[in-house]
Amino acid sequence: MPHYRSRTSTHGRNMAGARALWRATGMKDGDFGKPIIAVVNSFTQFVPGHVHLKDLGALVASQIEAAGGVAKEFNTIAVDDGIAMGHGGMLYSLPSRELIADSVEYMVNAHCADAMVCISNCDKITPGMLMAAMRLNIPVVFVSGGPMEAGKVVSPTDGKVIKLDLVDAMIKAADPNVSDAEAEQVERSACPTCGSCSGMFTANSMNCLTEAIGLALPGNGTIVATHAWRRGLFEQAGRLVVDLCRRYYEQDDASVLPRSIATKAAFENAMSLDVAMGGSTNTVLHLLAAAQEAGVDFTMADIDRISRKVPCLCKAAPATDKYHIEDVHRAGGILGILGELGRANLLDLSCGNVHSGTLGQAIAQWDVAGGAGEAAQTFYRAAPGGVPTTVAFSQDKTFLTLDLDRKAGCIRSKEHAYSQDGGLAVLYGNLAEKGCIVKTAGVDESQWVFTGRARVFESQEDAVEGILGDKVEAGDVVIIRYEGPKGGPGMQEMLYPTSYLKSKGLGKTCALFTDGRFSGGSSGLVIGHASPEAAEGGAIGLVEDGDVIEIDIPKRRMHLAVDDAELARRRAAMDARGDKAWQPLDRERVVSLALQAYAALATSADRGAVRDLSQIKR
């Protein structure tokens, strides 16, 4: 029978000092026999996805204590990728994932907590906490802050409501044909409420995937942050984690532990969902990283295999301007997509979860198109309120009807899929021997096979300058290199270059290839995560202006049309540069000691950009 971890610091005469300190936090005699549960919050006033979380830790804590536990809250850091985008701040985004994972481990292990409720929301916070949960392997429930409502403006031409998000503001601002007044209206309307950005961007993708893995409650990824019914997820999480504690520590039920739930089959289910919903390409990095922390052998080869058999069943911004996450919720949310995947025999329904036994049981209870009961039918009618606010649970609007149209609605059946090819794909070739990632859900089918000439940039900044300076033309393949985990360092997101290609009218006539990564808001023929990266000797570092690049998504091919002898000559010339080899020639970039430490241990994207501690020389 496992022992409560907290009793290390709460029991025995030799822990008198620790108990004295616990008493100073408010604990009483009767509390020392209860489970101590960490409420892992991530409130910050810097991030709209987290600005409303301040009081939600206390809400969860109240339910933990009502259920017989002791709640102790702490915060992690949280970086807003949108605010950090387009300048040196983006170098810190991906490395912050490792800091978050480490900080959760440090706090939970230092204080011998028995379990956790992880209150996350945005891009690196959910994966960082997920990595920590896999390391610690103690009972955990994830509950996120929820998605932002989509922005809305009325079209001056036809009076119809147009849905907006952050990316629209960026594209309009960079388009010289858009007036200052129109650009300002879009900017003021694009992000109306608290919550994670309203499309199928990285934050929402990850919060949806925690549902599929089995560590979050139904609705976690899709019910908007402002809706009153989201409060119930936080309250239920607080009560549920105490029950999970008792099952593990008092009944020796290890099935409730994260590593028991997040098996290889669960990661494959999550990836199947990701491919079906066209999730952010960043999710590939984060699932690979979490799987490594869990000790699960889940690799790019598994992702490639899944991407070849799972169709695209759901589209939301940026893949379409018709639907945002609030519309995915109305169509049945993540359990609705999982229900369609289940009917197509594309899931392992025996996988467990924290709330409903098995995935199959969860689908039976919550899949609104599969006969779920009145509670589910009501829950998925939760709608946006349409009032700008930073306050959680501040409105209770509902849709009049659900979107159950599986032929032409937001979520579709396999028979009526947006495409039988999935929403994400892994490409291989001499430009990416270990793979690269494209979000096919966001690529116009006319570009699935594309040949163009390389236009090479040694940094994101140079690429932005080149695009805005009209140095990129239709038919070009923009190459942005030395932006990988090690070469950046930090693997910057390329949202500005992809947005500016659209602003210049090149969104459907150019491609972009990088060893960096993309915001979930990027769309178009944009291919990232080139592995190995340029700084690790990847062939992307050998591309020259004018080289022919061949892209074939159906054949999963990424090819540099240069013969092997010429590539060998270029590689030898690069190696001959000695200490300057595999580095950008003329890039001015200040790299702090903290980022240098990350770069020294960072792996390429095919391994999730995790740190490789074997690189430490003793």
Swiss-Prot record:
GO MF annotation terms: 2 iron, 2 sulfur cluster binding; dihydroxy-acid dehydratase activity; magnesium ion binding
Catalytic residue positions: S519
Entry keywords, A to Z: 2Fe-2S, Amino-acid biosynthesis, Branched-chain amino acid biosynthesis, Iron, Iron-sulfur, Lyase, Magnesium, Metal-binding
Residues the record lists as N6-carboxylysine modifications: K124
TM region positions: none
Annotated GO CC locations: cytosol
Annotated positions binding [2Fe-2S] cluster: C122, C197
Enzyme Commission (EC) number: 4.2.1.9
InterPro entries per record: Dihydro-acid_dehy_C, DihydroxyA_deHydtase, DiOHA_6PGluconate_deHydtase_CS, ILV_EDD_C, ILV_EDD_N, IlvD/EDD_N
GO terms for biological process, alphabetical: isoleucine biosynthetic process; L-valine biosynthetic process
Cofactor(s) named in the record: [2Fe-2S] cluster; Mg(2+)
Record field: catalytic activity: (2R)-2,3-dihydroxy-3-methylbutanoate = 3-methyl-2-oxobutanoate + H2O; (2R,3R)-2,3-dihydroxy-3-methylpentanoate = (S)-3-methyl-2-oxopentanoate + H2O
Gene3D superfamilies cross-referenced by the UniProt entry: IlvD/EDD C-terminal domain-like
Residues reported to bind Mg(2+): D81, D123, K124, E493
Keyword Magnesium: yes
Family label: Belongs to the IlvD/Edd family.
Protein purpose: Functions in the biosynthesis of branched-chain amino acids. Catalyzes the dehydration of (2R,3R)-2,3-dihydroxy-3-methylpentanoate (2,3-dihydroxy-3-methylvalerate) into 2-oxo-3-methylpentanoate (2-oxo-3-methylvalerate) and of (2R)-2,3-dihydroxy-3-methylbutanoate (2,3-dihydroxyisovalerate) into 2-oxo-3-methylbutanoate (2-oxoisovalerate), the penultimate precursor to L-isoleucine and L-valine, respectively.
UniProt name for this protein: Dihydroxy-acid dehydratase
